[in-house]
């Protein structure tokens, strides 16, 4: 129901204000949602508990029911902002198109698309201007370039570059955060335990410890640290 989406956005507004979140993109689907969140205070898990908990309470009260709305814990990834911010912004607003619910992001009201391309005042927690400024400092040109960028990416998948189920970034980014795991009590511990893995071996180590080429390929890929392209080029 549209009222339910409005309730979610109202709760999100309160959470962003309380936890100092910045939202770069969002899309509310019928049974899940996507948020691209920047957390200057490393408080993702606290904010997510508040967001899901308060929203669930409000929806259950409205519909006179009890229980959970979402199955399992949320999934989160640590993103290299320089490399993947725009890619994720595009991916998120295209969700309804990929799901074949609409033909264009402009037909789905419950994402940040309309704030990006329209003359609608954005909520204070939505980083509309900062995203548009990456395309042009002229707003009209920025909107045009942003729109073209989004529509050019309907068939593009970014998830082949996901490492360890947690990191979306290049090798340098992954190595940086892996090497700081013990110090990142505020960052990596924000992620569900099942998403955290011990650092993978090098491709050469997998090769040396495996009895066959196929086994080395399987173990390397299963580690989540390497894409098939990485393995093929080794």
Segments the model singles out, each with a brief description of its role:
Residues 1-25, 29-30, 38-234:
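Short Pro-Cys-Gly-centered "Cys-loop" motif that presents a nucleophilic cysteine in a tight turn
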């Amino acid at each position: 129901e549209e009222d339910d989406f409005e309730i979610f956005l109202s709760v999100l507004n309160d959470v962003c204000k309380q936890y100092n979140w910045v939202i770069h993109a969002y899309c509310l689907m019928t049974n899940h949602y996507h948020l691209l969140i920047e957390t200057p205070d490393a408080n993702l898990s606290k904010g997510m508990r508040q967001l899901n908990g308060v929203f669930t309470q409000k929806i259950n009260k409205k519909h006179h029911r009890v229980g959970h709305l979402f199955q399992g814990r949320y999934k989160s990834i640590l993103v290299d902002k320089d490399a993947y911010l725009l890619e994720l912004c595009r991916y998120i607003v295209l969700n309804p198109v990929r799901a074949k619910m609409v033909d264009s992001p402009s037909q789905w009201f419950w994402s940040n698309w309309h704030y990006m391309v329209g003359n609608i005042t954005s909520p204070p927690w939505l980083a509309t201007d900062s995203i548009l400024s990456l395309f042009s400092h002229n707003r009209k040109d920025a909107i045009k370039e942003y729109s073209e960028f989004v529509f050019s990416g309907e068939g593009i998948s970014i998830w082949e570059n996901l490492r360890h189920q947690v990191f979306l970034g290049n090798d340098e980014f992954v190595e940086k955060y892996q090497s700081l795991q013990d110090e990142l009590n505020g960052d990596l511990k924000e992620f569900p335990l099942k998403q955290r893995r011990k650092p993978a071996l090098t491709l050469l180590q997998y090769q040396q410890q495996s009895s066959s080429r196929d086994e080395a390929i399987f173990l390397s890929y299963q580690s989540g640290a390497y894409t098939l392209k990485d393995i093929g080029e080794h």
